[in-house]
UniProtKB/Swiss-Prot annotation:
It is found in: Nucleus; Cytoplasm; Cytoplasm, Cytoskeleton, Microtubule organizing center, Centrosome. It comes from Mus musculus. Detected in sensory epithelial cells of the inner ear but not in adjacent surrounding tissue (at protein level). Residues 809-830 have a biased composition (Polar residues). InterPro entries: Storkhead-box_winged-helix (IPR019391), STOX1/2 (IPR040126). This is Storkhead-box protein 1. It comes from the Eukaryota. GO terms for biological process: cell division; cellular response to nitrosative stress; inner ear development; negative regulation of gene expression; positive regulation of cell cycle; positive regulation of G1/S transition of mitotic cell cycle; positive regulation of G2/M transition of mitotic cell cycle; positive regulation of gene expression. One of its GO terms (cellular component) is cytosol.
Length: 990
C-alpha cells in the first residue's frame, strides 16, 4: 500500500459572512472573494508587512457557506495570524470575517496503477481529438498523432493497430468511411458528420475536465501546477506519464526533432504520403497540436485488408461504402501531376492534359473524343435541320426527280379504288359531297378546291390577252368571235415534269379492273364509282390533283368551246339552275354509257319519233375533217348556240347536214337495224322545238375521211380492227362513251356539255374513238372496219346474252320529272347543248352550250368482242335512278387493246413531229394505264402495214391532240367542280 500523501500543507481558512441578508442569494464565487480580500489588505500602506504578506497569498479553494482557503509561505501566514489578533485584518467589501484558523494537511492514500495503458482507449482518444480538429484520420496519421501527443506509451506496430481498430469497429465504438475513422456517438446514424464532430469535441472537453479525479496518465493535471510552484520538492506520482506542463513541452519538442530525422530517412519510400500529410499538418496548425508527419514503416496491403475487413459490418445500415478511396486516399493524385487552378483553367497546356487523359484511360484517346464530338455535333445539326421542316424540301426535290414513282403510285391508288367499287365508304362520301362536287376517284373526292401539287412550278404570269379571256371566261356567252382561237396552241403543260415511262406500269394496274357491275350513289347526288373512270376527270380541275394551276390559267385564257352532243337530262336538279349541276360539267353516268354500235345491236329501241336522231348524227358527221385537219375553219360559234331560241337561223342550214350524215350512215351500214339506246333514255320533252334544238346541238363534222380510210384496209384488216375495237371503253372501266363530235372551228368555241346521271354520251358506231378535237381517235382504223362485222356482232350478242336488251333509268317517262328548260331562260344561257334518249318515244332534247369552253373530250367505246358477250344488267325498280351500273371489260379483250395500242403509240411517236407539246403527250399517255407487252400477235406485218398506211392520219390527229388542256382550262375558269370522262385518256382508245 502506498504511503499517504498530505494535501494543502500550511493552508489558512477564512470564514466570511455577508453584511446584508440579501447578498446571500447573489453570493459571488471563491476566486472573486479571494481577489477582493487580497486587494483590501494590500492597500494598508501604513502596515508594510501586512501589505506584503497579502500580495503573496494564493487561492487554494472555496467551500460552501463562505469558507475561503488560502495558501502562502509560512512567514506570510504568521503575519496574517498577528493581524487577525490585533483586529487589523481587513475583510472583502460587503463581507465580514467571522473566523480565521489553520487547516491541518489533508491526508490521501494514493491508488496503485497498472503499468500498461489500454491501446483501444488511447486510439479512441486520439481519433476523438483528430475529429475535433477536423483532421482526416488514417492509420498513418493516427500513429503520428500517438507519437506526438502520447509520448509515455510505446508506439504500436501496424498489425496491432489494424487489429485494434477492427475490434473497435466491431464494438461499434468507431466506424470507417472513405474519409477516415470517426467516433460513434448516439446520433451517428441519424445526423451528418458535422454535428457529430462538434459533439465529440464537447465530450472530449468534458472528459478532460474530469481527468484529475481518474488518475490516469492520459489526463493532464494542469490544475496542480499552481501548488507545485509553491513547493520545490515536486515529483511525478506515476513514472509512466508526464504530468507537468514544462516537461511535456520539452518532450514534445524533442520528439518533433526525432520525428523529422526519421521522416528524412524514410522520404524515399513514402513520398506521396508525406505530401498529403504535410498539407494536413498545415491545415491543423491552429489547433495547437504538434503534428509529426513522419510515416511509419508498414505495409499498405494490410491497411487495405483491414479497411475492407470491417467495412461491410459497420455500414450495412448506413450507406454504401466508398471502398475505392481507401487505398488511394494518401496517394492520389500523383506528385508529378500538375494541379489545375480552379480560378483559371487555362494554365495547364493541352498536351499535358492529353497525356493525363491517356494515362488515366488509354482507350479514351483524344482522337476518339474528337471523332465522337464531331459525330454528335453532326447529329444535332441534322436533328435541328429536320425539326425546322427542311425535310419537306428534300421530299419535294425527290418528287421532282422521280415523277415516275408518283405517277405509278397515283395509278395504283386509282386501280385499287376500282376494286372497292360499291363499298359503303364510297356511297357515304357520295352522299356527303352533295351535288356541287363530282368525285372521280377516292383521291379526288377529298378535294373541294383546286390545289397546286407540291411538285408543280409556280403559275406563270398571264399575258394581257389571257387576262381578258380569264375575266370573260366567267360568262363565255359574252366572248366575241375575235377572242376565240387565240391561245389554243400554247402548251399548258410547259414547266411541268415529264412522266417517265409511266406507261409501263399500266398493265398491272389495268388488270385490276373488275368484271362485276358496280352500283354507286343515288340520282340526287350522282357520282362515279371508285372502280370506274370518271367521265369528267379530264376537265375537273378541282378533283384532278395532277393538273397544276398553270394549266388552268392558260386554259382559262384559251377560247371557249361549245359542246356538241353530251346527254343532259331534264330533272328537278337541273330545273333548280346551274347551281346544282353547273354548265360545262360532265355529270356521271358510267353505267349508262355504251357505244353507238351497242345501241344499234339492240332491236326495238328506236321508235318512229326517234328517226330524226340518226339524221342529225349523219348530218353533223359530214361537216368535219376527222383526221387530216385540212379544213381548219376559223368561224366562231354563232350566238344562237348559246340560247334555247328555237327560231335560230341556223336550223335551215343544218338540214342539209342531217341529210348528209343520214346518207353516210346508210353507206356504212349503220342503219340496217333500228339501233336503240335504251340505256340512254331521257326525259320526254313535249315542246315542239326539240327537233330543231337537237339539230343545233349536233353540229357533227362531215365524214370526208371515212371513204379514204375505208380504201386502205382489206377485209382481213377490218376483221382485226374490229377485234381490236371490241373492248368497250379502252382505258376506261365500262362501256362508257360520249357522243361529242365537233368541227375544227368547234374545237375552239364549243364546250363539252355535262350529262346528268342515267343519261350517257354516245360515240358513233364502228369503234371510232373521238379525240378532244371531235375527230375519231383511232389511228389507222376506219369505220368500215367495224361495220363489216356489224351484223355478226349483233347476232352473237343477242344469242349469247339474254339480257342484251338494256333498261333505262326509268321504266317509263312518268317516273322522272319532265321540266322544261324554257322555264329558266336566264339559266338556259349557260346550259350546254345536248340530246337525251328515253325508252318512250321522244324527240332528242337539246340544251344550250352557254358554258362552252374547253370540255370537248370524246370518249369512245367500241363494240365488245363477239367471244365475250356484253352483259347489260337490268336494273331493279328500286335501283332505278339511283346507282349507275359500271361496265367492266374482259381481260382478253383488254390485252388485245393494250397490245394494239402499243404498236399505234410506237408509230405515232415515230411519225409524229417533235413539238413543244411532247411533255403533254407523255402526260396523256401516262394516265392511260397501257402496257407495253406484245404477246397477242399484233406484231404481224398486217398490223405494221396498217399503221404505216395511216401515218399521215397520225400527223393530223397529233396536231389536234393537244387541244385538250385548252378545253379544260376554260372549264376550270368557271369554278365548276366536275370530273372528266377520262383522266387524260389518250386519243387512241382501241
Amino acid at each position: 500500500m502506498a504511503r499517504p500523501v498530505q494535501l494543502a500543507p500550511g493552508s489558512l481558512a477564512l470564514v466570511l459572512s455577508p453584511r446584508e441578508a440579501g447578498q446571500a442569494a447573489g453570493e459571488p464565487g471563491g476566486r472573486a472573494l479571494f481577489r477582493a480580500f487580497r486587494r483590501a489588505n494590500a492597500r494598508c500602506f501604513w502596515n508594510a508587512r501586512l501589505a506584503r504578506a497579502a500580495s503573496r497569498l494564493a487561492f487554494l479553494g472555496w467551500l460552501r457557506r463562505g469558507v475561503l482557503l488560502v495558501r502562502a509561505p509560512q512567514p506570510c501566514v504568521q503575519v496574517l495570524r498577528d493581524a487577525w489578533r490585533r483586529r487589523a485584518l481587513r475583510p472583502p467589501r460587503g463581507f465580514r470575517i467571522t473566523a480565521v484558523g489553520d487547516v491541518f494537511p489533508v491526508q490521501m492514500s494514493p491508488i496503485a496503477q497498472c503499468r500498461f495503458v489500454p491501446l483501444a482507449e488511447v486510439l479512441c482518444c486520439a481519433i476523438a481529438d483528430m475529429n475535433a480538429a477536423q483532421v482526416m484520420v488514417t492509420q498513418q496519421s493516427l500513429l503520428e498523432h500517438l507519437i506526438k501527443h502520447y509520448p509515455g506509451i510505446a508506439v504500436p506496430s501496424p498489425d496491432i493497430l489494424y487489429s485494434t481498430l477492427g475490434a473497435l469497429i466491431q464494438e461499434r465504438k468507431i466506424y470507417h468511411t472513405g474519409e477516415g475513422y470517426f467516433i460513434v456517438t448516439p446520433s451517428t446514424y441519424f445526423i451528418t458528420n458535422t454535428p457529430m464532430q462538434g459533439n465529440k469535441s464537447a465530450l472530449l472537453s468534458n472528459e478532460g475536465c474530469s481527468g484529475p479525479t481518474s488518475g490516469t496518465y492520459l489526463v493532464s493535471v494542469d490544475c496542480c501546477a499552481e501548488p507545485t510552484q509553491e513547493n520545490e520538492a515536486l515529483f511525478s506520482h506515476c513514472p509512466s506519464c508526464q504530468c507537468y506542463p514544462d516537461t511535456s513541452m520539452c518532450d514534445s519538442k524533442d520528439l518533433l526533432t526525432a520525428a523529422e530525422v526519421t521522416r528524412k530517412s524514410q522520404e524515399g519510400l513514402e513520398e506521396t504520403t508525406a505530401l498529403t500529410e504535410n498539407q494536413v499538418v498545415s491545415a491543423s496548425e491552429d489547433t495547437h497540436i504538434c503534428v509529426n508527419p513522419k510515416p511509419l514503416p508498414y505495409t499498405k496491403d494490410k491497411g487495405k485488408r483491414f479497411g475492407f475487413g470491417f467495412l461491410w459490418r459497420s455500414l450495412s445500415r448506413k450507406e454504401k461504402p466508398k471502398a475505392e478511396y481507401h487505398s488511394f486516399s494518401a496517394q492520389f493524385p500523383p506528385e508529378e501531376w500538375p494541379v489545375r487552378d480552379e480560378d483559371s483553367s487555362t494554365k495547364i497546356p493541352r498536351d499535358v492534359e492529353h497525356a493525363l487523359i491517356k494515362r488515366i484511360n488509354p482507350v479514351l484517346t483524344v482522337d476518339n473524343l474528337t471523332k465522337h464530338t464531331a459525330l454528335m455535333q453532326k447529329y444535332e445539326e441534322q436533328k435541328k435541320y429536320n425539326s425546322q421542316g427542311t425535310s419537306m424540301d428534300i421530299l419535294t426535290t425527290r418528287h421532282k426527280d422521280s415523277s415516275k414513282e408518283v405517277i405509278g403510285k397515283r395509278q395504283g391508288q386509282f386501280a385499287k379504288s376500282r376494286r372497292r367499287g360499291s363499298s359503303h365508304k364510297g356511297r357515304h362520301k357520295a352522299r356527303s359531297q352533295g351535288s356541287e362536287l363530282e368525285p372521280g376517284n377516292p383521291g379526288q373526292e377529298k378535294e373541294k378546291q383546286p390545289k397546286v401539287p407540291a411538285a408543280q412550278p409556280a403559275p406563270r404570269t398571264k399575258s394581257p390577252s389571257e387576262q381578258v379571256h380569264h375575266l370573260q371566261g366567267r360568262n363565255p356567252a359574252v366572248l366575241g368571235s375575235h377572242l376565240i382561237y387565240k391561245k389554243q396552241i400554247n402548251n399548258p403543260f410547259q414547266g411541268m415534269h415529264l412522266r417517265k415511262h409511266s406507261v409501263s406500269k399500266g398493265h398491272a394496274v389495268q388488270k385490276t379492273h373488275g368484271l362485276k357491275p358496280t352500283c354507286v350513289g343515288p340520282e340526287e347526288k350522282p357520282f362515279w364509282s371508285a372502280g370506274s373512270s370518271d367521265p369528267s376527270g379530264v376537265f375537273d380541275g378541282e378533283a384532278q390533283p395532277p393538273y397544276p394551276e398553270q394549266c388552268r390559267d392558260k386554259l382559262e385564257a384559251g377560247s371557249t368551246q361549245v359542246a356538241k352532243a353530251p346527254v343532259h337530262p331534264v330533272s328537278d336538279d337541273f330545273r333548280g339552275g346551274p347551281g346544282n349541276y353547273p354548265p360545262r360539267r360532265v355529270l356521271p353516268g358510267p353505267s349508262r354509257c355504251c357505244s353507238f354500235r351497242e345501241s344499234m345491236l339492240r332491236p326495238g329501241v328506236y321508235h318512229e319519233e326517234n328517226k330524226d336522231l340518226p339524221e342529225v348524227l349523219r348530218k353533223s358527221w359530214s361537216t368535219c375533217d376527222m383526221f387530216l385537219g385540212t379544213k381548219e375553219k376559223k368561224q366562231a360559234l354563232p350566238a344562237q348556240r348559246c340560247s334555247l331560241d328555237p327560231d335560230s337561223s341556223s336550223v335551215h342550214a343544218e338540214d342539209k347536214t342531217v341529210d348528209k350524215i343520214l346518207h353516210q350512215f346508210q353507206n356504212l351500214g349503220l342503219l340496217d337495224c333500228p339501233a336503240g339506246a335504251n340505256r340512254l333514255r331521257t326525259h320526254e320533252r313535249q315542246d315542239g322545238n326539240s327537233e330543231e334544238l337537237s339539230r343545233k346541238a349536233l353540229q357533227i363534222p362531215e365524214a370526208e375521211i371515212v371513204n379514204m380510210e375505208n380504201e386502205g384496209l382489206s377485209d382481213s384488216e377490218q376483221d382485226q380492227v374490229a377485234l381490236s375495237h371490241s373492248d368497250p371503253g379502252a382505258g376506261d372501266d365500262g362501256g362508257c362513251s360520249s357522243l361529242c363530235l365537233e368541227d375544227d372551228d368547234f374545237s375552239e368555241t364549243d364546250d363539252f356539255c355535262p350529262s346528268l346521271p342515267g343519261h350517257t354520251q354516245h360515240s358513233f358506231a364502228g369503234g371510232g374513238t373521238w379525240n378532244h378535237l371531235g375527230t375519231p381517235a383511232m389511228t389507222g382504223k376506219s369505220l368500215t372496219d367495224c361495220n363489216s362485222k356489224a351484223h355478226r356482232l349483233e347476232l352473237l350478242a343477242i344469242e349469247r346474252n339474254p339480257w342484251y336488251k338494256a333498261t333505262g333509268l326509268f321504266s317509263n317517262a312518268g317516273e322522272s320529272p319532265n321540266p322544261d328548260l324554257s322555264d329558266n331562260p336566264g339559266q338556259n344561257s349557260r346550259i350546254p347543248w345536248g340530246f337525251n334518249y328515253e325508252g318512250e318515244p321522244t324527240v332528242a332534247h337539246v340544251q344550250t352550250p352557254a358554258a362552252a369552253a374547253g370540255r370537248s373530250l370524246l370518249a369512245c367505246s367500241t363494240v365488245r368482242t363477239t367471244s365475250f358477250p356484253v352483259e347489260i344488267l337490268q336494273e331493279s325498280p328500286g335501283d332505278r335512278g339511283k346507282s349507275p351500273i359500271v361496265w367492266r371489260q374482259s381481260l382478253p379483250s383488254q390485252e388485245m387493246k393494250e397490245h394494239f395500242t402499243d404498236k399505234l403509240q410506237l408509230v405515232k411517236t415515230s411519225h409524229g413531229p417533235v413539238s413543244a407539246q411532247e411533255p403533254q403527250g407523255e402526260h396523256l399517255e401516262g394516265t392511260e394505264n397501257y402496257s407495253m407487252t406484245g404477246d397477242s400477235g399484233i406484231d404481224s406485218p398486217r398490223t405494221q402495214s396498217l399503221v404505216s398506211t395511216n401515218s399521215a392520219i397520225l400527223d393530223g390527229f397529233k396536231r389536234r391532240q393537244h387541244f385538250l388542256p385548252n378545253r379544260e382550262g376554260v372549264q376550270k375558269s368557271q369554278n365548276l367542280a366536275s370530273n372528266s370522262l377520262f383522266q387524260l385518256t389518250p386519243a387512241i382508245n382501241v
